[in-house]
Each structure stands twice: as C-alpha cells, then as structure tokens.
C-alpha cells in the first residue's frame, strides 16, 4: 500500500546502510554532467550555519552528524503510527529533533474526498480521531517534536486538496486541528507552513496557533531558464516568501528546500542555503527535501530530482 510503503521508507530507511559513501557536507568538485554518479550536492555546513536537517527517505543523511532535524511526512488516514517509535529511536541516536508533516488525507490511490467535503468533515469533527491518534502517538516520543499540518495552503496548483479551501476555511480548519492536537501533545511546537506565495497572509491562523513559520524554497535550473531567462539564487528565491511572513514576528524555517541543475548551479545553492544571511535574520533552520519531486513542474520541465546524491539504479 502506497501510504504504508512511503511512511516505512521515511521512518525506517535511515537505519539501512546506503549503497554509496558520500561526504558529510559539501559538493564534489568534479566537472561532469549534472547527475554524476559520485556527486553530492547537499548544503555546505560550517560552524556558523543555520541549523540543518533533512527529509531523507534514501538514507543519504544516515551518518551525517551535521543534520539536526529529521523530517517525516505522514497522512492521517491509512497509516501505521507504530512506526513513529522507530523514527524516534533513529532521531535520538543521532541527536535530532523531529519535524512531522501531517497531511489531512490518505496516500491510498483510491482516496477520493473533494475539498469541500474534507473541510466540512474537519470542521464537523469527523477527523478528530485521526488527528488525536497522530498526536497521541507523537506524545509518546522522546525526541523534541514540531507538528506541521496541511502545508502550502495558499498555492492551489492542484497538488493538495486543502489548497482549494478559501482562507477563512483553512484558518478555521487549522485552528480546530491544532486545538485537538494540543490536548494530547501540549509540549510540541506548531509550524504554520505556507509555500511563500502572494496572498499567504490571509491564511495566517493567529499568533496563538503558530510557534514557527515554515517556507518551501526550490531552485530548478531548467525552470529558471524559461521563467526568468537566467539562473536564480537561493537568496533570490527565498526573499519574497520570507518578506511576506517576517511581519508575524515568529521564528522562520525553510521546511522544504531543494535545488537541481548543473554543477555550477548546485554548487552555488549548496554554498548559500545554510549560510546566515543578513536578509534573513529570523531564519532558524533549513531542512532539505531529499527526494524526487512528486508532481511535474510547469512549463513541461518534468519532475526535478532534489536528491543530494545519485541513485543510479532508481
């Protein structure tokens, strides 16, 4: 089943030994094609870096002592929550906290609930048990936990059912769900996580419901060429979303970071991603999304591969 397979990969694959050996940080200097078998493009980490972390279903960060945040994704339907204990043990062994993204749907292929029905169900209490189960399981974990619910809500590009709700509906649903979760998990931090697009402010649920704000930042060289006619930088891609949320006065993180392009493009992003920038004084963490993109990007550029290391047999 897709949901159980994906969650198992997220939670347990890190315990496996990766088929290749990669540097803990940095980018190889080989001048080769953009997907060299031995290339590692993970962000470069120094003593001054913003706290790094990763969503790592391919186990490339298993032995990376720099990574301090283990990012997990799970649906709130059709999921084996017992596997969270394995993720907790894995994170504690590596002295990492847990960032848990909870998506209000199922990953089953036959899941068919429209936006309005999902919203009505949440507000009507039909999914209270789902969130209670997730948060009750998370309350048993020993690692520090941050809960991120229904991300990128302001970007209705067709990827997420909840992104078709209007701002009022989203805010009401978010507050309802966080109230439920806090009954079981009062010690958690709660992350509100827009993509960073224009209009996101209308979806802000209020200071009482937000401990930290998470953004999504991606750089894809083929898309850059079509959209702006040149390569974009990490700062350039991050600044619009950061500027839109900084007025809320909350700590800010990049909950999902990815970049893909030729060696020069990847090197530039790797060097800048976790560096402290004067433009982003409230940035507290940058968490890499170490997987392929799930959906094709616009302009017929396909599905970017954000993975930091090549997996030639995939």
Please report, for each region that a protein language model flagged, where it lies by residue:
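Substrate-binding cleft of extracellular glycoside hydrolase catalytic domains
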Residues: 81, 86-189, 289
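Bacterial N-terminal signal peptides
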Residues: 10-19
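Distinct, well-ordered alpha-helical segments
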Residues: 196-209, 266-267
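Aromatic-lined carbohydrate-recognition surfaces of secreted/lumenal glycan-active proteins
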Residues: 174, 178-200, 251-262, 288
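Substrate-binding cleft of secreted/luminal carbohydrate-active enzymes
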Residues: 36, 43, 253-314
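Acidic (Asp/Glu)-rich catalytic clusters
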Residues: 58-65, 82-100, 134-142, 204-208, ...
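N-terminal substrate-binding region of glycoside hydrolase catalytic domains
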Residues: 29-129, 259-262, 287-288
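Glycoside hydrolase catalytic-domain groove-lining segments
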Residues: 85-103, 205-208, 212-262
